[in-house]
Regions:
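Intrinsically disordered, low-complexity repeat and linker tracts
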Residues: 442-532, 552-553
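C-terminal membrane-anchoring or membrane-association module
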Residues: 538-553
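Solvent-exposed loop/turn segments at secondary-structure junctions
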Residues: 33-34, 139-144, 178-182, 218-223, ...
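Extended non-catalytic accessory segments flanking core domains
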Residues: 1-133, 137, 141-145, 150-169, ...
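His/acidic metal-ligating clusters that form di-metal
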Residues: 285, 289, 296, 322-351
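N-terminal, active-site-proximal structural segment of metallo-dependent hydrolase catalytic domains
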Residues: 102-233, 308-319, 325-334, 346, ...
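Structured beta-strand-rich core segments of catalytic domains in phosphoester-bond hydrolases
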Residues: 192-303
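Metal-dependent phosphoester-hydrolase catalytic domains
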Residues: 28, 83-118, 238-280, 337-349, ...
């Protein structure tokens, strides 16, 4: 992203740096893969990358106010199978091109990737009698329709098995992207009870617990997502472990309310008629009782990022058009939690879901306020991700909990999807996240101390290094190939990236931009630090090439 669109500065600006390499042969030194192949692209770092600290799987976590522009996209085609930590034993040579609002390297050689050994993991958190376990999982357009283009049976089995063997039968499961019973068949169907029950039945068939399912169906066509599918939030719960507060369920347009600290109707959607929730999913509030204690679980799926400017697109500086809507939604949800805690300070609130925003975002800050703790932001920084997009591990799935129970909570993302492809067992584009809350003692009050928060996870931040730590990894080949510019680059001024995956798939058809304050996207990455060294390195390599040109060619 350019902060000054009128100045050309390849030494300090990511967009200009890539533009300076377009059409040139380049070499990426023995790269390692950062995430799964998606729509023909993989993202890599060269072996000579010495910039930002890597996370626990050798990737780069997205950071505040920056994009990881040091990552290099390589076009490998849709049949190429690769996952995080895989690597290439040889250098990759190719031509820098531009398509779909992004620069990438198109190899001039046959590529063979080596297995880096990364495995899907199971949660360390185990069931316990006095501890309540809540999981959150975006199950990516799930319905009872098993047609080829809907939810095939093998996906149902994969997700069901993950709840049994990898998440260990949590007591409550919040489900994101549950579709209506027939999926994208647009016939006016809104109920998703068959979809939720199909998953519950498959879990039981495979040896898991017996779950019940609850939801509030949306108004037909009003909540965004894939046309005709009516995605919504749903909740599975184990009635042998928790009891659903016995109340009449709210209708689609009835707003959740508290009376003496308890939901008037259960389940109910939060402010379904608020303008900030137009054409997007409404948050679902459900009240349970565990060991005699009230627990209100709020499942969320906030507005997607479709509509934001691409960081290398024609509009510069790039603007995050969708952020004001998520901030407004967060404010509505936070006010709801405040009212519940005001009426009954001993209620445990747990907010889960796909917030379509990061753990460090203003959206997360508004949601937390002074009443809640974001457990993801307290977790080990090297393990702090649930999603992979455009070269960065990042957080879209957070869990917030009442401050009075934060010190009694154990949080864990379960990395079974985001770093992998379907060939490795991936069932969704999101990793599930879970929290286990210890109810064995009396509830405490107030905000947890620093020592108490330390029990949640290591809060070690991945701070930005000085610019002197960064080495180059993408250098021009000795022979320029401007004449080999890809014909696909001709669309650079008008292409909109069709695979912007910070979304609930084809939501663009139904979501509308919300006017409001404009927020600048995080900068494209250390423009004044490691990108400056990229430029210096390129200049240095160019000088070396020039001196050797007569003897080399």
């Amino acid at each position: 992203m350019k902060t000054n669109p009128t100045a050309y500065a390849p030494e300090t600006d990511a967009l200009d740096y890539w533009e300076s390499l377009e059409g040139m042969f380049t070499v990426v030194k023995k790269p390692h893969v950062l995430g799964p192949q998606y729509k023909g692209d993989i993202y890599v770092l060269g072996e000579d990358f010495t910039g930002l600290p890597l996370n626990n799987i050798g990737g780069l976590n997205l950071r505040p106010h920056a994009q990881n522009t040091a990552t290099i996209p390589i076009y490998v085609g849709n049949q190429f199978v690769a996952k995080a930590k895989d690597y290439f034993a040889e250098d990759v040579t190719g031509v820098v091109t531009y398509r779909n609002s992004f620069y990438k390297v198109e190899p001039t050689q046959q590529l063979t990737v080596q297995d880096g050994g990364l495995q899907r993991q199971a949660a360390q958190t185990q069931p316990s009698e006095d501890k309540l376990t809540i999981a959150s999982y975006n199950i990516e357009n799930f319905s009872a329709n098993n047609d080829k283009n809907e939810t095939p049976e093998d996906k149902v089995t994969l997700i069901a098995n993950s709840f049994i063997h990898e998440i260990h039968n949590p007591d409550i499961i919040t489900l994101i992207e549950v579709q209506d019973n027939n999926g994208s068949v647009d016939d006016g169907t809104t109920s998703g009870l068959e979809s939720g029950r199909k998953l519950a039945n498959r879990i039981k068939e495979l040896g898991g617990k017996s779950y019940e399912y609850t939801e509030v169906a949306p108004v037909d066509g009003a909540d965004g997502g894939k046309p005709g599918s009516n995605i919504r939030l749903g909740i599975l719960y184990n009635p042998e472990r928790v009891s659903l507060a016995k109340k009449e369920a709210a209708t689609s347009n009835e707003a959740a309310q508290f009376d003496k600290g308890h939901l008037v109707k259960n389940p109910a959607r939060i402010a379904p008629n608020d303008p900030s929730f137009d054409h997007t999913r409404k948050s679902l509030a459900v009240e349970f009782e565990f060991k005699g204690q009230p627990v209100v679980v709020i499942a969320n799926h906030l507005k997607s990022k479709i509509g934001d400017d691409a960081i290398y697109g024609a509009s510069q500086p790039a603007v995050e058009h969708t952020l004001p809507t998520r901030e407004a939604q967060a404010s509505v949800i936070h006010q709801f939690v405040q009212e519940g805690l005001k009426q009954n300070p001993k209620t445990t609130f747990v907010l889960t879901g796909d917030f379509n925003d990061y753990d460090f975002s203003t959206t997360a800050q508004i949601l937390a306020g002074s009443e809640l703790t974001n457990l993801m932001s307290q977790h080990d920084a090297g393990d702090r991700y649930s999603y992979f997009y455009r070269g960065s591990n990042q957080v879209l799935d957070n869990i917030f909990i009442s401050n009075n129970m934060a010190a009694k909570a154990r949080f864990e993302p379960v990395h079974i999807n985001a770093s992998f492809m379907k060939e490795h067992g991936r069932a969704s584009d999101h990793d599930p996240v879970l929290v286990q809350i210890d109810f064995s003692g009396a509830q405490t009050s107030g905000t947890p101390t620093d020592d108490q928060q330390g029990n949640i996870g290591q809060a070690t931040e991945q701070t930005s290094p000085s610019s002197s730590n960064t080495g180059t990894q993408l250098v021009p080949h000795q022979a320029q190939a401007n004449e080999q510019k890809s014909s696909t680059s001709e669309s650079k001024e008008k292409d909109k990236d069709e695979d912007e995956k910070q979304e609930d798939k084809e939501e663009a058809a139904t979501e509308t931009k919300t006017p409001g304050k404009r927020k600048i996207l995080p900068s494209t990455g250390q423009e004044t630090s490691y990108l400056a060294l990229f430029g210096v390195a390129v200049v240095t390599m160019s000088l070396i090439w020039y001196k050797k040109k007569r003897t080399t060619y």
